[in-house]
Amino acid sequence: MNEHTQAEMVEVVKKFFDGVFDGDKWNYDVHNEIIFSGGIKGVSGKITDFRFCITVGEELVTCYHVAPINVPVEQRVAVSEFITRVNYNLNNGNFEMDFNDGELRYKATVSQNDLLRDDATALRSMNYLMTLGLAMWMRYGDNFAALLFGFAGDKSIEDLVNQCETEE
C-alpha cells in the first residue's frame, strides 16, 4: 500500500484537466469521485473521435481511450488476432476488446508516485497518459477500420499489423 491517498491522486487528475499545470483545460465529467470521462475529437485517420475514461486506483491511474465503434460478433475473432499481434510488440499499454459487446479500447497506466512527485512530473505523466492511447490509435486505427469495414483487400491480419509497424 502506498503512503499517498486515492484522494490526493484524484486532486492531481482534476488539476490536470482544469489546466492548473499548463493552462490547457479539458471538458470532463467526474463519476463516483474516482472516474473521469470525456471526449477527444480530431485525431487523424479513419477513426477520429474517442471517449476517454480515467480511473484512479490505489496505486495506478488508468486511462482507456475507447473507439466509437463496436466490433460485430462475426469479426471479433479476426480483431482479437489483430490485437494480439499488435500487443505482442507494445512496450507500454495495450489494446483490449470486450467479447460481450465488441467495445475496442486502448489502456495506459501511470503510477501514483509519478503523479505526486512534483507538478512538472505530474504534467508529463498526465500528458503521457492522455496522448499514448491517441498515438496508438493513430498508428493502428486505419488498419482496425480496414479490417472492420472490408478495406483490407487480400492483406492478411499479419500484413495489416506489419504495415502499421513499418510506416513512419
Q: Where is each model-derived feature located?
A:
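Short histidine-centered catalytic/ligand-binding loop motif
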Residues: 2, 64-72, 119-122, 126
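Amphipathic alpha-helical segments
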Residues: 4-28
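Ser/Thr-rich, low-complexity intrinsically disordered terminal regions
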Residues: 19-47, 61-63, 67-68
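Short, charged/polar, Gly/Pro-enriched secondary-structure boundary elements
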Residues: 43-49, 112-115
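Short, conserved beta-strand/beta-arch hydrophobic-aromatic motifs that form part
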Residues: 52-54, 59-74
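Short, internal acidic amphipathic alpha-helical interface segments
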Residues: 67-105
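Charged, low-complexity intrinsically disordered regions
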Residues: 95-151
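Short, highly charged C-terminal tails/helix-capping segments
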Residues: 144-168
